[in-house]
């Protein structure tokens, strides 16, 4: 396969997954923005977490709220649980990698906050434990999942599932959906 054909293959896969986003999923995206906006309006904090590329997306999306998405505005309370290397390595070393996000949420999360957990497979034990911890702390949980949702399916208060087997395509949709949510938040909060 030459470069042009490979390019075309990737664009076609992206287009197919994008077209699979139905009205039901779009309503969930709007609902996520509503929940997060309400939390932020009431002085809540939005927590993000994910592994690998999803960790990068959690940092990116958290920064869209702290910095800005489309408009210059006041910063919004948002934290990526994947960003503090000292906490991550301490928790992984002392308690196990499966606790790297849930332990932080246990310490920081409170009723009225929101956690958004990203996992392309839905099988990351640390994401599953974070969703379980969210329930204990009464933190509203949103999951961005892919494939068939894995072990995390039906564990969050609100689930956005991308029906694809391609990690790259799932991550593309997760970041797109996250940015749509950031845009909706700015509009809902009239910032």
Which ranges hold each PLM region?
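Structured helix-beta-strand junction loops
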Residues: 17, 42-43, 111, 155
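Hydrophobic beta-strand scaffold residues
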Residues: 46-47, 141
